[in-house]
Regions:
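Beta-rich catalytic cores
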Residues: 31
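Acidic-basic catalytic patches of nuclease active cores, encompassing PD-(D/E)XK
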Residues: 1-27
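Nucleic-acid nuclease catalytic cores
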Residues: 70-98
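Intrinsically disordered, low-complexity terminal regions enriched in charged/polar residues
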Residues: 90-142
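Conserved catalytic cores of phosphodiester-cleaving nucleases, focusing on short active-site segments
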Residues: 35-37, 41-55
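Active-site-adjacent loop/helix micro-motif of nuclease/hydrolase catalytic cores
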Residues: 53-64
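Short amphipathic alpha-helical segments and helix-helix/interface helices
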Residues: 13, 66-70
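A structural signal for short, well-ordered beta-strand segments and their strand-loop junctions
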Residues: 25, 46, 79-83
Length: 142
């Protein structure tokens, strides 16, 4: 499973680089993001990525992940990329304000433990995404 996720992350990095970004994949490290480099405008940037097999109207961002990213140097642009069956979403975390923390019963983040626990999360709406690229033939009813 982790190899598949890393392959998806690398594919996203490749696609972004085709659009003028200069990113390297960091998903195999213990850093709180999956890619780092510069935007097409030359600004320092990091991207955290999530790949969802099921479509949900809101996109979950764990408060701990958000805090780890937003507390990086202020000259770094922080992005959250979500891919689901409907579309690909890019959230610019630097501009999100007044996020409302919620507690949800979610799966543990470890692959070795199938248990669930309460997590503090932000629920991001699709309207908050900076860029949305619809997936063709998306089936959101699954």
């Amino acid at each position: 499973m982790i190899k598949k996720i890393h392959s998806l992350e690398k594919a996203v990095v490749f696609a972004f680089n085709l659009e003028g970004w200069d990113l390297i994949h960091t998903g195999e490290t213990c850093l709180p993001f999956d890619a780092q480099g510069t935007t097409p405008k030359g600004r320092k940037a990091v991207i955290e990525m999530k790949f969802r097999e099921k479509y949900y109207e809101t996109k979950i961002l764990e408060v701990s992940k958000y805090n780890a990213l937003i507390n990086l140097d202020t000259d770094i642009e922080k992005f959250y990329y979500v891919q689901d069956p409907k579309a690909n979403y890019l959230f610019w975390l630097n501009e999100l304000i007044d996020l409302q923390k919620q507690e949800l019963y979610c799966p543990n983040t470890t692959m070795w433990n199938k248990s669930k626990r309460n997590k503090n999360v932000y629920l991001l709406t699709e309207e908050q995404a900076r860029i949305i690229n619809p997936n063709t033939n998306a089936d959101t009813e699954t």
